[in-house]
Amino acid sequence: MTTQLTDAKAGVITEAMRRVAESEGQGADLIRDETAAGRLVIPANKVHLNDNLQPAGIGRVLRTKVNANIGTSSVRCSVQAEIEKMEAALAVGADAIMDLSTGGDLDAIRVELLAHCPVPFGTVPIYQVIEGRQVEDVTRDIILRTIEKQAKQGVDFFTIHAGVLREHLPLVEKRVMGIVSRGGALLAKWMLHYDQQNPLYEMFDEICDLMAEYDVCFSLGDGLRPGAIADATDEAQIAELRTLGELTQRAQERGCQVMVEGPGHVPFHQIQYNMEIQQKICHGAPFYVLGPLVTDIAPGYDHITSAIGGCAAAFYGASFLCYVTPREHLGLPNTDDVRAGVVAAKIAAHAADLARGLKGAATRDRELSVARSNLDWKTHLATSLDPQTADRMHREACQEIGATELHSADYCSMCGQHWCSARINREVREALGGRRTVTSSSSPAR
């Protein structure tokens, strides 16, 4: 039985590693070495990999990845609606999908989504463990059987809340929001009812062995993540993080790939510290953050508060951003919310990659800028992060100025013909040195 991690440690470059290297423009040796060191993961369940999965890597030497959460609830449950959300997320560049369904036939929903999902696919198994029963009725056997079943179905990464310990619970009493993680809250209730330790922690080695069999990647859940700015970087959060550092090593020693989940709600000035301490405590394992949201006061706009924090997080150490939609804290997102959330997170991820000088990150920006300078609308729109939205807005502008040929207009409705700086600049260039079109090699990229 081998995994991407054990193969990498043995010096083997797997086909998945080669495909990641090719898609990222990196050397396969680098992918193997970073995987072996535990600083890069390739969530690729053997079942999904043999079906329709396009392997993707998550780590600091690669571009920052973005995950989109979808899933049913007891209030709204439609498999087709979730497929449409997933397709919308993928259309604007989501690198991974998580199914957080809590309503309906969870197995049927998961299998159907997996059949349509070409990117890494994650779940939170404890949700299915709890669904349809009281928390007090959960047994260790139910937990293990659920994890094994989902692994057999092809899930690529599991959020496992094994770091929430019985002794951590008193630390959340003085919090404003307490425990905001659904998995963390459910496990806390179980521990208090039985006055026992977290069963995921106690059975961790058994869980590792089940996951290693199918090469399911750990996403060690932060059940005590702060859900309010007032709770950020508190004693409970750091205590759990130290446990996650211990579990990271234990899982890797048993051949499992590991990434670690992080906050949450964090004021901007604490983000750098949060990223750096995670890297230190968790031995460089990829950090997967929900946001973080940098303020609590923007319901309806939390895709923006999240993008601000996500950009800083990715610059200072995170490798994987979980999107937040405009409907966060307000309700289950619809397809439009999903699109908005992914786009905001993609902007944050790309801006961070630019700032940290990632190889090739500036290429697309320069291509678009050259097209913009040359009033090449076709390339301008096609190169944008969300061509569909950019094209719609440009069409509306062309209608406003009466342009019949969308891609030949030499101005837009923002400045009008006589005030268009791009058009005027072209005239200036012509006057200075003859007719010259700016190209991608006209001047060095910075």
Task: Give the location of each predicted region.
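Catalytic or ion-coupling anion/metal-binding cores of large enzyme and transporter domains
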Residues: 170-194, 226-232, 250, 269, ...
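C-terminal catalytic subdomain
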Residues: 297-306, 311-358
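Short hydrophobic alpha-helical segments that form membrane-spanning helices or hydrophobic packing faces
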Residues: 18-19, 45, 324, 421-425
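Alpha/beta enzyme core
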Residues: 3-295, 301, 307-320, 402
